[in-house]
């Protein structure tokens, strides 16, 4: 830049003030006006003249214009001011053209040929006050602005006083200050939108125009200086607002700011705005209509500026773009004011019709509006529109949709704007900007605009002449606030650069800096080239590029931008892409598949566009609407898809690529494909196919790969057709599959073949090259006159003839073997030579001949038909009801052995075969058998026989069939036979409660359980010997049962539980141990004659009840234990398990149990009845239910430890004893009884143990023992009972000896075993060498009481495994029995484990007489050896069948019923019964997951009615039955022809109203109902048909002039004819004939009424 801004500053300020306020404003609102008389002086202050025009002296030896000085002096407020000013030579260039137009004519035109000397810049000096700059114009007095003591002063000649010779001209001086009213914040509105898209037709014109400029187009991305030669037009509103003298300076100031914006480095290109012409319109132009409607104004202005533009780009006044500045309030699309600030055509620059814009004058921000619209002309889109440079909420840019001025941030160009304008220039669309303007251009002022226009002036430009700056509102460099009336308003823009913001400070780029500070201009410099980028494509021809930036340094402060190449490109990745890969354009289109278009997602496919090959045009795959998705495709995209070309797109421009794959190299191939070749290696092959006969497709010849200049043509016209196929016989390029295609271009083997058919003559041409061999075929329809073909290929380098090459090739496929459905096609083999074509098979090698091919072929679907299966056997062998059935389906044949079933409706058009037919009805059936009633059962209980009579009823003539004779006898089973028993408790029977009240609550717990009733009201006997007192039984109370109770009375439990299926015991076995087996006991029936009760279900909420169980009728010896070998029974718990006491893993069952140990053993034993105190009976009150696996878990031993806790295991060996319910470890969920082998007698197994195994020297008991029922469980071995070395000897007395005392007993238990009580103090041998047995006389029987911890040597505290259990004994007495031996009584062992793990089972115990001989005890009072036991229900999950899937496709679900049931009778249980077992099976599963298929719909059939509302139907089927969504099933019918059954009926045409000269014919038109034949009153019912014409012209020919007959006189009287004439009747022919004298003939010029057209309706 030149070094002149500092000098230009004052002179431009002077010019601004000279062109400042309009006339008449000098004295308005000015305070402190002072009259001064300036004079011109010399440098020393000496007077020179009263004439103020500066005189310039020039030296002849100075060739260039030099600035001369001028000095002025004046007295102001007693101070002498001296102005030192200099001429500004840079304000306007020579040749400046300023036109003033009036009434559409050139009122004034001024061409500046020299720099005027009256525009001065300088300073003012005062001896005392601080001076400042001055900008003064002395062309007509002194006008301008100067600074004094940091205040602005204006000077102007005094209005109305002219200069007088010899006298100083008076001037007025006043301060420049605005109103200091209280500032109020006002509303501010953002600027409106702008920009106008180029219409498609004009865009095509641009493309055509640009193609004509190809010779000037730059082929690389080069940064080159661009000069925008600009025409600026200010309309009459601008002149009216600013005043004619001031508008020129104002426009130049605005354009100077615009030029500065385009010099900002953010634009990325060196662009200069140069004004070549300025037009000021004082009046409205005739051809330029400026209105509020911005689009119409822009259209008018573009047309007007084109007409006045001077042709020829070299002319000094030729402009590249035109700018209209107006004070009209513009609106984009309506003729009324709104918020639009400007409008322009996008990418319209350099186009003669589109390079124009309109901007609304809003004051100093007008510069940003002009720059914004010029940006649109450069092809820049709004930030955020189609790009990612949205500025809302972020930094504003010049191209923001709305011009928002951020506080303190200058407006610059965004990154997207830089890319848009660079692409515009690189595409060659700015060719008109390359020429540098001539020297005769308008020079723009370089002074900052704020120096010329202070804040008050800027406010007046924005809001009117009465607006002033609002002080103290905000930093003026950030936001300019102006007064409008009594409030302050702002357009949120900052004051322009150069505006004073404080003492000796001004605004510069939004900041307040010291005055006069202007940063030094820095010219830009190129950076180094970047590394080559990645290739734009992974295959095919791509592009990679390298760039450099103008960043070293970045141009600043109006420094020059870099000039030169900024981007270079080269090709890369030359290998071709695989043929099955989508094209590069297709890939770019598919990137928009995930974006919504018109509310839906689409799959986009490319659309070729040869007019704009480097734009991305795509369309949805299911639509034909084409959209331009990108302004430019990715670099490396081929320009054309429809033709062979190497040209690629680069920066949106189609670049030519030579055969050497260098951009713009110009290298070309010769006719056989040699790059830069001369054709010397080319060879043309020419052949003719002359076979005249053929059938179907016949091979003619082979065109090899790489062939060029291909020509195939028929020698003469014929009805045959040419076809092209690949080496794969299934792949046809043209006219394959017996289908003839249209004329046109077709892609074949990588090239384009042009198919032409004129009449019956066909030919094919292609430039080539072919990428694969192509077979030429002829589809014979008649005799072949001959086919000629030729092509050009490259000759081998050694110029030798190749030997013939023979190979097998497959021919075309034969016709399908079926006419419908699926058939078979076969493909034959031919022997082919590479160039000769088909030859005899003998030339090919028969050893490598491949097999002929075969494939399925699908023709049209076969029509549906009925299919009937085989007849089934007759349902009756005789009689009238015999029927035979068969399956009948509607099927469609899919192949030779494949059919598909269809809906029955598909075969409705065919008669359906019979599915049923009568059969065997002629056969007479034999007579039937008659049966009598069954007799009574032969027994009263148990199993018996019943009978009936059978007779043949002769109801037919045929005898009865003996094979069908019914049975006459059958078994009958009554209730089991009961036997009498003395039962203590008869209060409960059966299942459930004896009380009428039932408690079904799950958690119901009775506060007090009622005791059982007493058997008799006799006094309580005294306990003697080993009899234990038993308390009297209380009356019965309520019994609580589970909701799901179990009645097992139907089960026959009156069988021998001791034998079961085993043998009877042998009497020889009953002889050991001093005790014998009891005799056979026959039970008696229960006194109450009630069914045997069952216990409540284990695990239920209510308490389990021990009723009076009926004993088993047969009890074997195995039911007894040896005398003295006792087993303690586990006392069940009566208290509920709390949540804290429940062991881990145990089910929360909530059953009751009793505390352990009991308070007294007396509670357990009591005499059976009076008179027999020696007999014992175990008390079975309702508080002692049978032991359960779960109730064992919280039992306590005598030391308080819970039973079932494990300890270090003792050596184990099974021993014969009765099992007790096993204890359960904390992790067990159900009992697991040990399984043992059972024999037929207990004694047989016990004797060997005592005699053989229990001998001295044996350290262990036998490991395996076979015992009879009840089953045996393992028990701990008993080492050390008599010491470690004192095992049991043979003959050791049994443990029933009465000499043993409880102090000498030791009790050992193991989980799942019976308690064995053995002597503990037998270490001193007796006289016979055997251990002495302690005397137990007077003590309780062994095993009846637990050994106290303080009296025994081993207790539970020392060994947790040894845990004594309480005994449970029971005896029944009968006074009728003979008296037993003295003190002899029945002794019972512990109850065994229940025979089942769930449901109803049985338990056993050993019963023996205390004397060792059962005969000493009363047999009738023998206690029950067995009873029922009822554990938890046998619960299991039971699943039902899966329901039908809710959806056949698309994801459905099916459900099933899952219940907890009893496995015995399948009764439902509550779910918690099944919780301990396996997890609950799922009751829901997914199904129908396969995707749904779309419904198939056929076309609509013909409407059922022609009118009045009919119905159309169509076929709606699913391709696979059940795999379509039913809710989406399309309708198979719809209404049609809903219009009424009416039509227009017309009558015949009537007679013409005139014989000639134009008449009218009429006819009757009626709307008639076609069903009733009656006319409709409302003609609108026929509106669905066109209205017939009801009249038409007729006799349009002219009437011949016939000389009327000579009229002598009127035939009627004169008066009468006159009367008719006056009445207008002369027009009637009869009247005219009768009154020929009175009625003159009609004039030929008067039209007749026949020409008048009557109304249609």
From Swiss-Prot:
Q: Which residues form a coiled coil?
A: none
- GO CC annotations? cell surface; extracellular matrix; extracellular region
Q: Which N-terminal stretch is annotated as signal sequence?
A: 1-20
Proregion residues are 21-220
- Disulfide linkage: 302-356, 331-338, 350-432, 389-416, 459-482, 470-488, 477-507, 501-512, 535-572, 539-577, 550-562
Q: Where does the UniProt annotation locate this protein?
A: Secreted, Extracellular space, Extracellular matrix
Protein's name in the database: A disintegrin and metalloproteinase with thrombospondin motifs 7
Location of the motif Cysteine switch: 192-199
Entry function: Metalloprotease. Was previously shown to degrade COMP. However, a later study found no activity against COMP.
How, per the record, is the cofactor bound?
Binds 1 zinc ion per subunit.
State the active site: 373
